Amino acid sequence: IKNCLTVFQHDPLLSGAIAYNLLTDRTDIVKPLGYDRSPSASMTDTDMKYIRLYLEENYDLTSEKKIIDAADLAAHQNSYHPVRDYLNSLTWDGTERIRYCLHHFLGAEADEYTFQVLRLFLLGAIHRAFHPGCKFEVMLCLVGGQGAGKSTFFRLLAGKDEWFSDDLRKLDDENVYRKLQGHWIIEMSEMIATANAKSIEEIKSFLSRQKEVYKIPYETHPADRLRQCVFGGTSNAMDFLPLDRSGNRRFLPVQVCPEQAEV
């Protein structure tokens, strides 16, 4: 493995070419490797075959397992987090935006509650990106008629489409981590729309989790996958929450009114 790792670290073509994506839990190709490949950053089996061919032709290294193990080590030594990099690249121009954001885009009331709810949600999203697994168990719920732009708002808030998902359908699926993997903001729409007392309790329990224990198919041992995402809800009805004597503090509803939006 040592010889293969040395090649990944110092070869002009391979050095810095693969990196471990801390958001997706996958290895990415982050610079050209001398052959045509798909636009996706994630390493594929075809990528690994080209890399093995390169090591065989140039260094007479042929052990598939050792090359794969060395590539994994090299990637982890060159890890990165795309959401953190994105957030660190932003420069504030001094203009306050959070206070009137939901009013501007969705026509929500421009009051203190709306401001504090969105501020809390954004702080939770940022904290989860920089400190995976931190405690954050509330959900911003946008309530309004169909076509009001609720889902679009969450998608745009994520920054990139691949950091957003609305594909979370079941909470008791053993593969639920795969639905969270690689996403920063996740919308729960169908579950909120059909919520009853039992399902609300399930959602509250799900929101309180700080990690999933999951074994990625190629791994030997299961690992704690600390949460890096936050959850938003959308509903067409303001009374989407059933009566709960223990309180529904985890759900922060905001009524939207697109007719009053400024865009």
Positions of the model-derived regions?
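Conserved AAA+/SF3 P-loop NTPase catalytic/coupling segment centered on the Walker-B
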Residues: W184-L207, L241-G247
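AAA+/SF3 P-loop NTPase mechanochemical coupling elements
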Residues: N175-G182, I216-T234
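Conserved RecA-like P-loop NTPase ATPase core
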Residues: S151, S189, I203, G232, ...
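Short glycine-/polar-rich loops that comprise or flank the Walker A/P-loop
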Residues: G182-W184, R209-Q210, R227-V230, S246-L252
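A short helix-turn-beta junction within AAA+ P-loop NTPase domains corresponding to the substrate/partner-engaging
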Residues: L241-A261
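Conserved catalytic/switch belt of AAA+ P-loop NTPases
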Residues: I200-A223
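P-loop NTPase catalytic core of nucleic-acid-dependent motor ATPases
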Residues: A71-Q181, I185
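N-terminal nucleic-acid engagement/recognition segments and initiation subdomains in replication
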Residues: I1-Y100, E112-Q116
